[in-house]
Amino acid sequence: MASKKVYELTQSGLDQLKDELTHLKDVKRVENLEALKEAREQGDLSENADYDAARNEQARIEARILEIESILKNVKIIRTNDDSTTVNIGKKVLLHFVEKNKDVEYHVVGTIEADPKNFKISIESPLGRAIKGKEVGDLVQIKSATNKQSNVEIKAIS
């Protein structure tokens, strides 16, 4: 029997998924059913672009609901130890990119919560793996997507 994937999330990430699931079921599903009803009222469904679009949206909504429900059945909440001095899920980390002489603060999260545009990096990303378990003052080398080496110093963990 295959083992199920366990999804590591912070409490915040779990709350966001639950909120998204509620929104999909209580708002998006209802809106989509109304759109389907309106499209059906237009007549011939064989060449009805509105109907096709509504059906595609319905499939997307239902797939996301199933995905979230599966995640919620296999979730492991990662509780951050505030006394911990090492990088792990749930921690905020101030990194100094030596070659660029630039400081950037990231929130280290589970894969599902990752959102690089909002400075949330997955612990399983190349950067996340490189800094996991490290402490303030540690210097790590990371390889960029273009295979360029960079030195990163951990300046703060909170």
UniProtKB/Swiss-Prot annotation:
The keyword Mitochondrion does not apply. GO terms for biological process: DNA-templated transcription elongation; regulation of DNA-templated transcription elongation. Residues 14-76 form a coiled coil. Gene3D superfamilies: Transcription elongation factor, GreA/GreB, C-terminal domain, Transcription elongation factor, GreA/GreB, N-terminal domain. One of its GO terms (molecular function) is DNA binding. The keyword Transcription regulation applies. PROSITE patterns: GREAB_1. Keywords: Coiled coil, DNA-binding, Transcription, Transcription regulation. InterPro entries: GreA/GreB_C_sf, TF_GreA/GreB_CS, Tscrpt_elong_fac_GreA, Tscrpt_elong_fac_GreA/B, Tscrpt_elong_fac_GreA/B_C, Tscrpt_elong_fac_GreA/B_fam, Tscrpt_elong_fac_GreA/B_N, Tscrpt_elong_fac_GreA/B_N_sf. PANTHER family: TRANSCRIPTION ELONGATION FACTOR GREA. Belongs to the GreA/GreB family. Necessary for efficient RNA polymerase transcription elongation past template-encoded arresting sites. The arresting sites in DNA have the property of trapping a certain fraction of elongating RNA polymerases that pass through, resulting in locked ternary complexes. Cleavage of the nascent transcript by cleavage factors such as GreA or GreB allows the resumption of elongation from the new 3'terminus. GreA releases sequences of 2 to 3 nucleotides. This is Transcription elongation factor GreA. It comes from Acholeplasma laidlawii (strain PG-8A).
